[in-house]
């Protein structure tokens, strides 16, 4: 060991340091034995260097010595997510899936409100009907005003009695006596029902008139029945004293037509 350290000790005396050195406060003494009976005192030097350059003045140059740098500790691998974190993420995912399925359930069923609580999370699902509705707007108050009193109707003027015209009573004449005399005679009666005509055609003179003398079998009028013109003849000879039936009027069977005085 002494023979191997001798060249190193000799070379150390001719070294030139290119960097600052930090000496320990209490250097430790090392003893190297070169020859029997001789001792060499050398001081151990601690240098905080990355690299030391050596320069020798002798012909024999020694190779540069490299100080061993402190090895950096290997980078720690990223910590893998713990099982508790994975379990939490998985539970949250399952919880969200459950909430989505519950929303579909509430929409498809007659459910107004649903509450779900799992661990420290609570979810409330409400339909629109369950949400608090805003208070209705106050309706405007209607003030009722009574209608104005109706005006009294105007007084009705007293109706004046209409003047009555005094009918002049006709003075009795001898006509009633004549009529009574005619009424005693048997009249010429209608043998059928129909329409009584005094003339053969409109606008022509009548067959007979009051005061005319007629003979038995003479045509005195026409009665229209069933669209047929039926001539009516006098039942006796005499004077026409009265025409009882009205022209162009309906007559029935045995209706008096004329009064003939023999």
Swiss-Prot record:
Residues 185-261 form the Biotinyl-binding domain. Signal peptide: none annotated. InterPro entries: 2-oxoacid_dehydrogenase, AcCoA_biotinCC, Biotin_BS, Biotin_lipoyl, Single_hybrid_motif. It comes from the Eukaryota. Residues 1-47 form a transit peptide. Keywords: Biotin, Chloroplast, Fatty acid biosynthesis, Fatty acid metabolism, Lipid biosynthesis, Lipid metabolism, Plastid, Transit peptide. Residues 132-160 have a biased composition (Pro residues). One of its GO terms (cellular component) is chloroplast. GO terms for biological process: fatty acid biosynthetic process. Its main location: plastid. One of its GO terms (molecular function) is acetyl-CoA carboxylase activity. It is found in: Plastid, Chloroplast. The keyword Plastid applies. The modification N6-biotinyllysine is found at residue 227. Pathway: Lipid metabolism; fatty acid biosynthesis. Residues 161-185 have a biased composition (Low complexity). The keyword Transit peptide applies. Residues 53-84, 125-185 are annotated as: Disordered. This protein is a component of the acetyl coenzyme A carboxylase complex; first, biotin carboxylase catalyzes the carboxylation of the carrier protein and then the transcarboxylase transfers the carboxyl group to form malonyl-CoA. This is Biotin carboxyl carrier protein of acetyl-CoA carboxylase, chloroplastic. It comes from Glycine max (Soybean). The lineage of its organism: Eukaryota, Viridiplantae, Streptophyta, Embryophyta, Tracheophyta.
């Amino acid at each position: 060991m002494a023979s191997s350290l001798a060249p190193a000790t000799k070379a150390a005396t001719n070294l030139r340091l290119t960097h600052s050195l930090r000496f320990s406060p209490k250097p430790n003494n090392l003893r190297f034995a070169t020859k029997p009976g001789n001792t060499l005192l050398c001081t151990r030097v601690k240098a905080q260097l990355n690299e030391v350059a050596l320069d020798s003045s002798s012909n024999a140059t020694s190779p540069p010595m490299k100080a061993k740098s402190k090895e950096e500790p290997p980078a720690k691998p990223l910590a893998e997510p713990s099982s508790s974190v994975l379990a939490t993420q998985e539970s949250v995912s399952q919880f969200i899936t459950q909430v989505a399925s519950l929303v579909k359930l509430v929409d498809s069923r007659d459910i107004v409100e649903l509450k779900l609580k799992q661990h420290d999370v609570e979810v409330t699902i409400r339909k629109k009907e369950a949400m608090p509705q805003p208070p209705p707007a106050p309706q405007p108050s209607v003030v009722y005003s009574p209608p104005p009193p109706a005006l009294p109707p105007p007084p009705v003027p007293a109706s004046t009695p209409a003047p009555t015209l005094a009918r002049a009573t006709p003075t009795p004449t001898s006509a009633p006596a004549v009529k009574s005399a005619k009424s005693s005679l048997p009249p010429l009666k209608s043998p059928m029902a129909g329409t009584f005509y005094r003339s053969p055609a409109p606008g022509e003179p009548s067959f007979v008139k009051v005061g005319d003398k007629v003979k038995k079998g003479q045509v005195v009028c026409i009665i229209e029945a069933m669209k047929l013109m039926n001539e009516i003849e006098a039942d006796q000879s005499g004077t026409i004293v009265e025409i009882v039936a009205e022209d162009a009027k309906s007559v029935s069977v045995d209706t008096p037509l004329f009064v003939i005085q023999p």
